[in-house]
Structures are given as structure tokens and as C-alpha cells.
Amino acid sequence: MLGICRGRRKFLAASLSLLCIPAITWIYLFSGSFEDGKPVSLSPLESQAHSPRYTASSQRERESLEVRMREVEEENRALRRQLSLAQGRAPSHRRGNHSKTYSMEEGTGDSENLRAGIVAGNSSECGQQPVVEKCETIHVAIVCAGYNASRDVVTLVKSVLFHRRNPLHFHLIADSIAEQILATLFQTWMVPAVRVDFYNADELKSEVSWIPNKHYSGIYGLMKLVLTKTLPANLERVIVLDTDITFATDIAELWAVFHKFKGQQVLGLVENQSDWYLGNLWKNHRPWPALGRGYNTGVILLLLDKLRKMKWEQMWRLTAERELMGMLSTSLADQDIFNAVIKQNPFLVYQLPCFWNVQLSDHTRSEQCYRDVSDLKVIHWNSPKKLRVKNKHVEFFRNLYLTFLEYDGNLLRRELFGCPSEADVNSENLQKQLSELDEDDLCYEFRRERFTVHRTHLYFLHYEYEPAADSTDVTLVAQLSMDRLQMLEAICKHWEGPISLALYLSDAEAQQFLRYAQGSEVLMSRHNVGYHIVYKEGQFYPVNLLRNVAMKHISTPYMFLSDIDFLPMYGLYEYLRKSVIQLDLANTKKAMIVPAFETLRYRLSFPKSKAELLSMLDMGTLFTFRYHVWTKGHAPTNFAKWRTATTPYRVEWEADFEPYVVVRRDCPEYDRRFVGFGWNKVAHIMELDVQEYEFIVLPNAYMIHMPHAPSFDITKFRSNKQYRICLKTLKEEFQQDMSRRYGFAALKYLTAENNS
């Protein structure tokens, strides 16, 4: 320590020299710039313009002064370089001193003593600034439960990833819903240097369920109290965040504050920015005990190792039991209990500067915390009103939040150069598959799309459905893009059963969809519709990937494989459930065909029965689907027979057959090599046939295709010759793969293709 401080004195002496040399020089020059008490300009031209006494000798003197000034400046620059080298060699007892250093404004915890010690020159740390190593992993814990909170977490994570320069390890205390959503999201996001671990929140309920809580977060709002018990025993420190947090700076700056903790300080918190704990918000307002204004727990720095040694579990439980005898319940969930503990043990807390948790609650005084934008580091939307909270600067905060809400998450897949990362099997396999492709191949983009991993957010809106107990339930499966959004309400009116939809959207479009859905009474009244967002990437519409995502996340034993442009007949849901029993789909390989028709009219009086449909067919109001452009697609359905059929009938597979079918949920997936327009359904029906599915046409079922503008992909198919060539190549490769997988049984498809 003596050597450290001796080096410090040398450093201070050198610094004083750096300051004194230019100061003395400028005093000399300044005094020499006066003649007879009047200022004399050092500029020869200015002097000549204003002084009649300008002479050649005085010009030489001033030129010599200017030369001397330049020499002094060169000496100063050299001295600065020496000082910077000396500072770089200065010994330090802090870890990671070779890495990036974050200098921060002090919090109030022991800050006066620290400043006094530095001024006195006898600080034990010699004024060393806190540091975070370049590749040090930052640990973040978040409690998340339910569908809405899962959406909020994504925005929080985006804001953290946008600014971060360090590896991150997220510890998510999640219920089964949030775990399913977020596990899929992070797995498909594939962000380098990010690790995610999940902890079952449902198993922790018994730890806090005995505490009555009036806060809107419910029982999950108390789970931060048990983090010392939940998180790994070898984890020493963690940043704990609420889901309604937005970062405006690098989280490493906050992580660096841990180095400022002293003595028994184990909690880093920002003071509450409302008068809640002062008890003067309304008459007879009785808050939980708190130190002054109390502290907000939206952002917490936890020293887990010290908390465990202090027996934190016992400490907060005893405090909660004692206070609940008088308070009966908590109003602000875990925050009330944290504050009650701090009231009794103020030495536990290190008060963070208020910009680490700028609170936008209903009664906030947070505007006193910041002066300009540069002061903001963390924004906390801690009001039930969220973005609708009243604040004179709320428009600025809202725009900052919306920036990350709509930010393209694919752009956050950037590498942290210079930091070794754990090998990710999925990422390595993807790179291997891509490296095997020939980039000079004219169909390279088509082939690449098959291996593209699209970021996926399951159950974007609240979903709640229990399949019927009789095991006949059927889910309608479809996929769509933003331009087909208007079909959702109509489909929901025609189909009362469960629906699974995969939506291909950008981040910004996902928010537009959210606003659209929340503004629709029809959609908000339905909780049995699963909306799964597959985020845009690449130039093709991944139609079969979308179908697979929607198929994979159904909870019923059967599914109706439809398309978003079709309206099913009224009552089709119940009719299909009866047909499942009638045709014994549970024990046989059958694909029930729903005959497809179309109209060219945007306003259609939808037929209520088969008789009405046949009448409209005869009048030319309806047509069999694609009869005029792609007859082969649905011709095997045998519409002539269907007109008079009263019982289900079997049809045989033919080339290019692509009906809409009802099958068991264990049927084969769609082949991902087919993207955009062409052969995506044909290939699937071919695979059903080779697996010996029977195609059964339902006599009293129908669906009608509604008119719409041509899609971008069909336009490319029609106008781009290379597109059609690549599609043909993919078809041939698919048929070859079928022959390899199914052998002799697949030969008929090659023959049928040659004859068609």
C-alpha cells in the first residue's frame, strides 16, 4: 500500500508540473503583452492596424515569443504522453485494470467520506476509479410471468443489447408460459455472447404466497425477495431489473458500481421519486415503514454472497411477519418489504444516483433528477398506465421506448470481437450448412432460405384454451403477412374453435399488429387464438416455415390446414369434430378434404348452406378454386360428384394436387425448401400420399377464397424467369429426396411429373 501511495504522490507531482508550466508561461506572456499599462496584441497584423509605434524590432520580439510558445506547447504534449504512460503502469489492487474504465458520478452511500479521503490524500484506494473488464460477464436477473410481461422483457433486452459491450448472462425467473415464449425467442435470436438460464417461478410460489399483496404484479412481484435462494450459490452479484425498464446506456456502467460498495453495503438502490412512503398522498394514507422517501426496487444491485452470509432469508421474513401484523398486506409488493428491512438496517444500502432509475409513476418527482438527455441512463415505467402516464417529458421518454420497441432485433446479432464465447451447437451447425452451399449457384438465395433461423415470438397475445375432453377438437392453422391482417376478424366470426396463426412481420409491424388487435373487440374477445410472430429476414416469404410454426404450437389432436384468404363455412368447426369420429381419424391415416371455392367479389353474401353455395355456383357468383388458372390443383376433389354427394368419398392422388385438409397433429411437416410462391402445398400432399394417407372428401363442408391483390411472390414468379427455373430445380431435388427416403413407393411421382 505504501508503494501504491508513493506512486500516487509522484503522479500528483507530475500533474502539478503539467499545470504549472503552461500557467507560468502564460503569466509571462500575458505580462509581456502590456506596454505602458495597455494591452499589446501578439498578432503583427493586428498591431500594425492599431499601433503607430509598430517597428521591425518589435515584430522580431513578438515572433520570438510565438516560437517560444510553440516550444512550450510541444514540451507540454511530451509531458502529457509521459504521464499517460506512467498512469498505465501504475499498480492497482482492483481486478481488470487493463480494461475499459467507466467513470461515474458518486451515489450518496459513503460518498462524502470517500471525497474527503481523496482530498486529504489518505484514501486507502488512492482514488482508483471502478472498472469492468472487457470480457467480464454481466449477470442480470428478471422475474417474468405471462404473455404481456414476455413482450415487455423483449423491449428491455433490446435496450440492453443495443448499448452493451460485454457478454451477458440473463437469469429469468419465469412461469411455464414465459419460459416457453422466451426460450424459443432466445434460441431463434442467436445473439452471440448471451447466455440465458430459466428458473421455475411456479416452484417458488410457496416461498412468498403467504404474503398478502395488493400490487398489480401479483405473487410474482414478491419473488425478488428469494433470489439469494433461487440463483446459483456461486453467483456473487447480480443486477435485478423489472420488466418495464428501458436502458439508455451501457449496462456495464451500472455493473461497475458494485466496486463502490463498502462495509456491509449489499443493496444498490435508487431513492423513490414519489412521496408514497412519506404518507402524504391522500388522507389516511398509511405506507409501509421506509427510510425517508424509501427506495424503488425496479433496479437493484445485489451482492448475493454477502446477503447469504447475513442470512437475508431470515432477515426479510422476520421483518415481513412483524409488519404484516399491522399492515395486513403489501401495496407495492417486494418494495415494501425491502424498505422495511432497510429502515431497520440502513447500513445495507448503497444509494445509487437517481439517473439509474428515472421513475415515471403517477406521483413522480423524477424531473428533479435530470437536467438534460445526457443525464438519463435508465427509464422505469412503474405505473399501471405505462406509456399513458402523465409527465411533462413523457413524449421524449415514449419516443425512446418506441425506438427499442420497433428496433430490428436481427441487427443485435453482432459479435463481441476480442471476447471468447461458448460454442453454440445450433450456430455452428448453421454455419456448416451455409458453408456447404455454392454462392455462385443462381439458386443460392433459395437454398440459403431453407437454413435461415428466423427469430420467433410465440403467443404474442394472451392465449387460454383447454381442448375438448372428447379428443375431437380441431385447430385452424394458417399463416399471413401484414397485408392480410384484415382477414382475421372475418375468420374469427366464421370459426369459433381454436386458431393457430403464424405472422411474418418486422418488429415495427408486430407493434402495428398489436395495436390493431387491442383495438378490435372481435379479436380481444377471443382467447383461443395463438398469434406467433416470425420476424422478417431475407428476401423470400418463408411460407412453409410459417405453416410449421403454426402447426407445432397447437393443443388439439387435429388440425385444419387452411390459408388466411379462405373463409370457412359457418358451423365447419362442429362439422369437422363430428367427421373426426365418423371417419375414425384417431386410428386411421386419413386426410379429410374441405372443398375450396372462390369469389371475385369483395362483398359477398356468404352462403349459409350447401344448397345456397350450389345456387351461387350455378349463377357464376362462385367458382371452384383456381379453375381458370390452375385446374389441376383441385380437380381430383371431383366437384361434380361433390354436388350430389351425401356421404364422404375417397379420391386418389394426382399430380399437382393441393387440397386443404384436416389431419392428425402428428402429420409430416411442410418442406422448408419451398418459399414464396409455388409447390409449397403440392409437396406436402405428395408426402402425405407416400405415407399412405387416404384422401376423403367431406360432402357438406366448404370454404371460400376471398379476392385480394396479387402477392409480391406470385408477381416475382410470373415476371422472373430465374425464379421459375429455381422452383423447377427445387421440385426435382425434392422428388429425388423422396425417392431416397421412400424407395420404390416414390417412383410414381417421377412418372406422374413426366406425364403432366
Swiss-Prot record:
One Pfam family named in its UniProt record: Glyco_transf_8
Topology with respect to the bilayer: Single-pass type II membrane protein
Parts forming coiled coils: 53-95
Transmembrane regions: 11-31
Top-tier EC class: transferase
Cytoplasmic topological segments: 1-10
Binding site for Mn(2+) 2: D563, D565
Start-end of Polar residues biased regions: 44-58
Spans annotated as Xylosyltransferase activity: 138-413
InterPro entries: Glyco_trans_8, Nucleotide-diphossugar_trans, Xyl/GlcA_transferase
Residue positions binding Mn(2+) 1: D242, D244
Catalytic activity: 3-O-[beta-D-GlcA-(1->3)-beta-D-Xyl-(1->4)-Rib-ol-P-Rib-ol-P-3-beta-D-GalNAc-(1->3)-beta-D-GlcNAc-(1->4)-(O-6-P-alpha-D-Man)]-Thr-[protein] + UDP-alpha-D-xylose = 3-O-[alpha-D-Xyl-(1->3)-beta-D-GlcA-(1->4)-beta-D-Xyl-(1->4)-Rib-ol-P-Rib-ol-P-3-beta-D-GalNAc-(1->3)-beta-D-GlcNAc-(1->4)-(O-6-P-alpha-D-Man)]-Thr-[protein] + UDP + H(+); 3-O-{(1->[3)-alpha-D-Xyl-(1->3)-beta-D-GlcA-(1->](n)-4)-beta-D-Xyl-(1->4)-Rib-ol-P-Rib-ol-P-3-beta-D-GalNAc-(1->3)-beta-D-GlcNAc-(1->4)-O-6-P-alpha-D-Man}-L-Thr-[protein] + UDP-alpha-D-glucuronate = 3-O-{beta-D-GlcA-(1->[3)-alpha-D-Xyl-(1->3)-beta-D-GlcA-(1->](n)-4)-beta-D-Xyl-(1->4)-Rib-ol-P-Rib-ol-P-3-beta-D-GalNAc-(1->3)-beta-D-GlcNAc-(1->4)-O-6-P-alpha-D-Man}-L-Thr-[protein] + UDP + H(+); 3-O-{beta-D-GlcA-(1->[3)-alpha-D-Xyl-(1->3)-beta-D-GlcA-(1->](n)-4)-beta-D-Xyl-(1->4)-Rib-ol-P-Rib-ol-P-3-beta-D-GalNAc-(1->3)-beta-D-GlcNAc-(1->4)-O-6-P-alpha-D-Man}-L-Thr-[protein] + UDP-alpha-D-xylose = 3-O-{(1->[3)-alpha-D-Xyl-(1->3)-beta-D-GlcA-(1->](n+1)-4)-beta-D-Xyl-(1->4)-Rib-ol-P-Rib-ol-P-3-beta-D-GalNAc-(1->3)-beta-D-GlcNAc-(1->4)-O-6-P-alpha-D-Man}-L-Thr-[protein] + UDP + H(+)
A GO CC term attached to the entry: plasma membrane
Chain positions carrying an annotated carbohydrate: N97, N122, N148, N272
Keyword Transmembrane (UniProt): yes
Record's compositionally biased regions (Basic and acidic residues): 59-69
Pathway the protein takes part in: Protein modification; protein glycosylation
Tissues with expression: Ubiquitous. Highest expression in heart, brain and skeletal muscle.
Predominant cellular place of this UniProt entry's protein: Golgi
Molecular function terms, GO-annotated: acetylglucosaminyltransferase activity; glucuronosyltransferase activity; glycosyltransferase activity; hexosyltransferase activity; manganese ion binding; UDP-xylosyltransferase activity; xylosyltransferase activity
Region of interest (Glucuronyltransferase activity), residue spans: 414-756
Activity-pH dependence: Optimum pH is 5 for xylosyltransferase activity. Optimum pH is from 5.5 to 8.0 for Beta-1,3-glucuronyltransferase activity.
Subunit organization: Interacts with DAG1 (via the N-terminal domain of alpha-DAG1); the interaction increases binding of DAG1 to laminin. Interacts with B4GAT1.
Disease with which this protein is associated in UniProt: Muscular dystrophy-dystroglycanopathy congenital with impaired intellectual development B6: A congenital muscular dystrophy associated with profound intellectual disability, white matter changes and structural brain abnormalities. Skeletal muscle biopsies show reduced immunolabeling of alpha-dystroglycan. Muscular dystrophy-dystroglycanopathy congenital with brain and eye anomalies A6: An autosomal recessive disorder characterized by congenital muscular dystrophy associated with cobblestone lissencephaly and other brain anomalies, eye malformations, profound intellectual disability, and death usually in the first years of life. Included diseases are the more severe Walker-Warburg syndrome and the slightly less severe muscle-eye-brain disease.
Protein function: Bifunctional glycosyltransferase with both alpha-1,3-xylosyltransferase and beta-1,3-glucuronyltransferase activities involved in the maturation of alpha-dystroglycan (DAG1) by glycosylation leading to DAG1 binding to laminin G-like domain-containing extracellular proteins with high affinity. Elongates the glucuronyl-beta-1,4-xylose-beta disaccharide primer structure initiated by B4GAT1 by adding repeating units [-3-Xylose-alpha-1,3-GlcA-beta-1-] to produce a heteropolysaccharide.
Protein name, per record: Xylosyl- and glucuronyltransferase LARGE1
Organism annotation: Homo sapiens
Lineage, uppermost ranks: Eukaryota, Metazoa, Chordata, Craniata, Vertebrata
